[in-house]
Amino acid sequence: MPTPKKGPRLGGSASQQKHLLSNMAASLIEHGAIKTTDAKAKVLRPYIEKIITKAKAGTVADRRAVLKLIPHKDVVAYLFDELAPKFENREGGYTRIIKLENRSGDNAPMSQISLVLEETVTSEANRATRAAASKQAEEAKAEEAEATEAEAEETTEEK
């Protein structure tokens, strides 16, 4: 991963930001969901998405690359062995961010970032119903076209 560019940092220098993201990613993988500020959640999302995509490939080189980013062997082993197969049919969108109430101490906007482990059954069911509806619409259009052609033939025969 490239070093962070110019702009605001989460908690100080680039090295501190790397460590912060590494620890947050490890906690997210270990617990499935973490509660953090909006800014940290928005920065963590692309970071963890890239890591999960590498874990889905599952090669030794990918495992070593992830170990450089998250130096927790047990967490990386859990990611590659148990979590990655759950995301096999998913092309991205492994996390979701849910807005929470502001923190009471400093009124900071809070969010919960969590892994999306549910199957996308609803979207597949929606696709199936849309496909069936489009087939029915095509059949209805074909029937209407046949009816109009039959009417046109009748009117030409009458003349």
Curated annotation (Swiss-Prot):
Coiled coil: none
GO MF annotation terms: structural constituent of ribosome
GO biological process per UniProt: translation
Keywords of the record: Ribonucleoprotein, Ribosomal protein
Transmembrane segments: none
Biased composition (Acidic residues): 145-159
Stored Pfam families: Ribosomal_L17 (PF01196)
One GO cellular component term: cytosolic large ribosomal subunit
InterPro entries attached to this UniProt entry: Ribosomal_bL17, Ribosomal_bL17_CS, Ribosomal_bL17_sf
Region (Disordered): 124-159
N-terminal signal peptide: none
Family per record: Belongs to the bacterial ribosomal protein bL17 family.
Protein name (database record): Large ribosomal subunit protein bL17
Organism whose genome encodes this protein: Corynebacterium aurimucosum (strain ATCC 700975 / DSM 44827 / CIP 107346 / CN-1)
